């Protein structure tokens, strides 16, 4: 199976959220690189990224940027065509920075680098308890099925389950699932699987022309997909934080 894998390090990793807000996790505090990368994204997919709301996540940095640098980044991103609207919730320093910038914090995109205090050693484990029979496994949530076409401007979300679409997903439409997505018609809009961060979710489609596909926030737009995969039956999955696409034999 032919697959697609882009192997390069970007200054900022952009993830797509299920609420239509993108999360820019800053890896390298290089304002010019971050702005140029965002400008290129907007140029490649203006309908997707033009004037898109963006959350800035500084959790991948060892030090929070100073106020002047953060202001320069926000201004540069606005000039690149997106709208930075908040910071990802994180440390007390990020809280202070958000106040100085006059932007809110969003806990949904929680930063993950707050230094942890040295914790005391854990208490000794309790003596083993008498073995009890395991409770019956919980039944998985039933998947959601959409029998009719998802038209431009519509959004369909399958919470805590897979999504099956028996018809087409039109351009400008969006289908989202916390699990995997199966599309038996043409996919011309956007499909976002693993919306709550499940990296094992997949997307299956019989006729692939997607504007965008995303798994656990990692995404790929149509312009980045080889021509020989367009119009084919494909599967999409995540491998080492990279979106891969392959034809179904």
UniProtKB/Swiss-Prot annotation:
Protein name, as recorded: Probable septum site-determining protein MinC
Biased segments, Pro residues type: 118-139
A Pfam cross-reference name: MinC_C
Organism domain of life: Bacteria
GO biological process, one term: regulation of cell division
InterPro entries: CAP/MinC_C (IPR016098), MinC (IPR013033), MinC_C_sf (IPR036145), MinC_N (IPR007874), Septum_form_inhib_MinC_C (IPR005526)
Family of this protein: Belongs to the MinC family.
Known partners and oligomeric status: Interacts with MinD and FtsZ.
Keyword Cell division included in the entry's annotation: yes
Species of origin: Xanthomonas axonopodis pv. citri (strain 306)
Alphabetical list of NCBIfam families matching this protein: minC
Region (Disordered): 115-144
Function: Cell division inhibitor that blocks the formation of polar Z ring septums. Rapidly oscillates between the poles of the cell to destabilize FtsZ filaments that have formed before they mature into polar Z rings. Prevents FtsZ polymerization.
Keywords annotated in UniProt: Cell cycle, Cell division, Septation
Record SUPFAM superfamilies: Cell-division inhibitor MinC, C-terminal domain (SSF63848)
């Amino acid at each position: 199976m032919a697959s697609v894998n882009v192997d390069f390090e970007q200054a900022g990793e952009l993830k797509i959220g299920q609420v239509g807000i993108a999360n820019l996790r800053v890896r390298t505090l290089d304002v010019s690189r971050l702005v140029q990368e965002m400008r290129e994204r907007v140029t490649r997919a203006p309908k997707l990224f033009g004037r898109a709301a963006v959350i800035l996540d500084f959790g991948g940095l060892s030090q929070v940027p100073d106020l002047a640098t953060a202001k320069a980044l926000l201004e540069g991103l606005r000039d690149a065509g997106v709208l930075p609207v908040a910071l990802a919730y994180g440390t007390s320093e990020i809280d202070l920075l958000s106040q100085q910038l006059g932007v809110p914090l969003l806990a949904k995109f929680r930063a993950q680098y707050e230094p942890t205090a040295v914790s005391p050693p854990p208490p000794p484990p309790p003596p083993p308890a008498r073995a009890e029979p395991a409770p019956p496994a919980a039944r998985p949530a039933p998947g959601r099925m959409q029998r009719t076409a998802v038209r431009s401007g519509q959004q369909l979300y399958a919470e805590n389950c897979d999504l099956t679409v028996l018809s087409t997903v039109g351009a400008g439409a969006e289908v989202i699932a916390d699990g995997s997505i199966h599309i038996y018609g043409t996919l011309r809009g956007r499909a976002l699987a693993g919306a709550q961060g499940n990296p094992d979710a997949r997307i299956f489609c019989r006729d692939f022309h997607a504007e965008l596909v995303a798994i656990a926030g990692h995404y790929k737009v149509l312009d980045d997909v080889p021509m020989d995969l367009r119009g084919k039956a494909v599967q999409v999955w995540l491998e080492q934080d990279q979106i891969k696409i392959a034809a179904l034999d």
